[in-house]
Amino acid sequence: MITKAIYPGTFDPITNGHLDLVTRASAMFSHVILAIADSSSKKPMFTLDERVALAKKVTALLKNVEVLGFSELMAEFAKKHNANILVRGLRSVSDFEYEWQLANMNRHLMPKLESVFLMPSEKWSFISSSLVKEVARHGGDITPFLPKPVTKALLAKLA
């Protein structure tokens, strides 16, 4: 049986924490779509095309991972791609409350859409794209938190 999962997010930019989760999801499911949200309301630093390109570069060795951008409701995107599993990361209790609401809304919109929650590896549990960008803006060392191509792209954006 082929199990197709979607790991959605803004990924602005993709971090080692995201990469950890997509790698683990790729071992659990036959096919994983890393779905990058347009999220123009969040005012991302990187364009959707840039985020897709960076994600493709850092997931290239994961043969069952496909990277796609999207702007529609997640339930609609899942239907269009015949996926019925959403993979989400939970770093904290506050993440759980938000994810619980999203999971229930998605299930309301698409009853067969299940959410699977993965805990990040401990060393990535405090990392977020927003935090990494803030550290970079203030000249801090971001190399431990991002794949090399992403570090290079982020530093170029800030130059």
Curated annotation (Swiss-Prot):
The organism's taxonomic lineage, starting at the top: Bacteria, Pseudomonadati, Pseudomonadota, Gammaproteobacteria, Enterobacterales
Residues the record lists as binding substrate: T10, K42, M74, R88
Reaction catalyzed: (R)-4'-phosphopantetheine + ATP + H(+) = 3'-dephospho-CoA + diphosphate
Protein name: Phosphopantetheine adenylyltransferase
Record's keyword terms, sorted: ATP-binding, Coenzyme A biosynthesis, Cytoplasm, Magnesium, Nucleotide-binding, Nucleotidyltransferase, Transferase
Protein species of origin: Yersinia pseudotuberculosis serotype I (strain IP32953)
Gene Ontology CC: cytoplasm
Family that this chain belongs to: Belongs to the bacterial CoaD family.
Quaternary state and interactors: Homohexamer.
Gene: coaD
PANTHER family: PHOSPHOPANTETHEINE ADENYLYLTRANSFERASE
